[in-house]
């Protein structure tokens, strides 16, 4: 096979049918069921999700971030508020994430609005992070900004390591914290044979995401 030609790369999907009668009324309950199955399938980082945002000039941008919590209210992730995504979400909170669970022929897309988490939630999670990751948050104060070279980053990290040696509590930087992506629309995709995939979309029609009414529609593949 000529791997230089993407058109020659094909994969047959053989996922089980997605029966609408078995879908949970609430999308985050359905997400919980699928996320559990993705973890049980021992996928590499099933909590990895592609986050898409819109820059102040209207240009889209995307990157992979890690899901760090979820419930019926939405999905939680953490970042540097000064990063490209942090700045984008501060100005335009609309965003979407994709969970690409290729190995089990599934994908979940969540569209919604990002809200900053409270200082209490941010402090609690930051305190749980490995010591090295805490230092990294301080060393990369202006995430996404250009740096001269790797040595500049290493020097910044070394200064932080000297200031907070192992066993020393590391405070959370004020520019570091989390977001809650509050869902407004969620799509579940199950790969099927002959590209006749099963797709179901949840759309919030009234109330809050956690207790409101969701309309479920089958979408054409």
Curated annotation (Swiss-Prot):
| Keyword Flavoprotein set for record | yes
Q: Which biological pathway?
A: Cofactor metabolism; pyridoxal 5'-phosphate salvage; pyridoxal 5'-phosphate from pyridoxamine 5'-phosphate: step 1/1; Cofactor metabolism; pyridoxal 5'-phosphate salvage; pyridoxal 5'-phosphate from pyridoxine 5'-phosphate: step 1/1
The EC class name is: oxidoreductase
Chain positions recorded as substrate binding sites: 10-13, 68, 125, 129, 133, 195-197
Tell me the segments the record calls region Disordered.
1-21
Cofactor(s) listed in the protein's UniProt record: FMN
Question: Pfam families this protein is in?
Answer: PNP_phzG_C, PNPOx_N
* Chain residues that bind FMN: 63-68, 78-79, 84-85, 107, 143-144, 189, 199
Note the InterPro entries from the entry.
Pyridox_Oxase (IPR000659), Pyridox_Oxase_CS (IPR019740), Pyridox_Oxase_N (IPR011576), Pyridoxamine_oxidase_dimer_C (IPR019576), Split_barrel_FMN-bd (IPR012349)
EC number(s) given by UniProt:
1.4.3.5
Q: Which PROSITE patterns match?
A: PYRIDOX_OXIDASE
**A molecular function (GO) term:** FMN binding
Q: Write out the GO biological process terms.
A: pyridoxine biosynthetic process
**Known catalytic reactions:** pyridoxamine 5'-phosphate + O2 + H2O = pyridoxal 5'-phosphate + H2O2 + NH4(+); pyridoxine 5'-phosphate + O2 = pyridoxal 5'-phosphate + H2O2
Give me the comment on cofactor binding. Binds 1 FMN per subunit.
Task: Give UniProt keywords alphabetically.
Answer: Flavoprotein, FMN, Oxidoreductase, Pyridoxine biosynthesis
Q: What does this protein do?
A: Catalyzes the oxidation of either pyridoxine 5'-phosphate (PNP) or pyridoxamine 5'-phosphate (PMP) into pyridoxal 5'-phosphate (PLP).
Q: Belongs to which family?
A: Belongs to the pyridoxamine 5'-phosphate oxidase family.
Describe the subunit structure: Homodimer.
Instruction: Name it.
Output: Pyridoxine/pyridoxamine 5'-phosphate oxidase
Recorded name of the encoding gene = pdxH
